[in-house]
């Protein structure tokens, strides 16, 4: 088991919906600090108390203050760990999940493997594809644009994944 660090802001009202927020890479729960209170207590910001969420924002395994896995794990295993956090540790019957960047990949696996407990996901990064690939000309054109976009914007990921110390010298 991995020790998990997370923010757990109980929402206002009688029945707030549990919402799991997952950060990206290289990121942290700091990405969510400005929205947690707004999601948990919408009535303080002109919203309706009935729209409140119990917000759970974990540091992903190996990130921030969460424990480090003893061996490398991928997004599917992280999805299982986070589902366990929500269902077994925090004792929610069901929840919603949101993820961006690496968190989106994990959210996809939560939605795929844990749909009994996770009722919906929201992602802001496309990571999973249909196993048979593009089906139409429009999808093929989108895939080509997406692949080109990845080439043009992927340098940071390659640099950080293969030579992370290099970037630290520029920060000194």
Predicted regions and their residues:
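Catalytic cores of eukaryotic secretory-pathway lumenal/extracellular enzymes that build
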Residues: 1-172
């Amino acid at each position: 088991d991995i020790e998990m660090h997370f923010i757990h802001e109980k929402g206002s009202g009688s029945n707030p919906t549990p919402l799991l927020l997952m950060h990206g890479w290289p990121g942290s729960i700091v990405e969510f600090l400005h929205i947690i209170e707004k999601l948990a207590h919408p009535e303080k910001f002109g919203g309706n108390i009935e729209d409140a969420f119990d917000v759970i924002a974990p540091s992903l395994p190996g990130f921030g203050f969460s424990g480090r896995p003893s061996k490398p794990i991928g997004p599917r295993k992280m999805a299982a760990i986070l589902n366990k956090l929500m269902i077994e540790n925090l004792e929610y019957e069901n929840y919603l999940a949101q993820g961006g960047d690496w968190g989106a990949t994990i959210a996809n696996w939560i939605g795929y493997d844990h749909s009994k407990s996770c009722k919906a996901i929201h992602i802001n990064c496309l990571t999973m594809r249909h196993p048979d690939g593009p089906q139409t000309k429009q999808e093929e054109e989108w895939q080509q644009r997406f692949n080109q976009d990845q080439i043009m914007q992927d340098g940071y990921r390659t640099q950080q994944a293969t030579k992370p110390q290099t970037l630290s010298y520029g920060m000194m």
